Regions:
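Carbohydrate-active catalytic/glycan-binding domains of CAZyme proteins
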Residues: 1-116
Length: 116
């Protein structure tokens, strides 16, 4: 759960992690107890999703505030393309008019450490 710009966002990971549909989605409400919008509307994960050939099953995420005290990040794990290991990933969270999105995510290549 995350409050942003006066609204409450409930984030969750969903679908079968072995499929390209698995990822992080959200529903939103004006009050913490709801009612909440229909999540995804059947369109699949909107915040973060698999990238065939690079990363599968991104999810099980947390939110963190960056060292600048302003930038939101998603911290999550994902399978590598060969499905031999799960990797820890970190991507900026962008607040767009269409809702939150993993900015430049999911990670599947080295990225600079936040604040450096």
């Amino acid at each position: 759960m995350r409050r942003h710009a006066g609204k409450y966002y409930c984030f969750y990971s969903g679908a079968n992690f072995l499929t390209d549909r698995y990822g992080v989605d959200f529903c939103v409400a004006d009050q913490v107890l709801g009612p909440y919008s229909e999540a995804g509307g059947g369109s699949g994960a909107r915040v973060l999703h698999s990238v065939p050939g690079h990363v599968r099953g991104p999810g099980h995420h947390s939110h963190a505030l960056g060292p600048d005290g302003r930038t939101d990040y998603l911290v999550y794990h994902a399978w590598n393309a060969a499905m031999t290991e799960r990797q820890l990933c970190l991507d900026p969270l962008a607040w767009t008019p269409a809702g939150p999105r993993a900015d430049r995510g999911p990670s599947y290549s080295p990225r600079p450490v936040p604040g450096q």
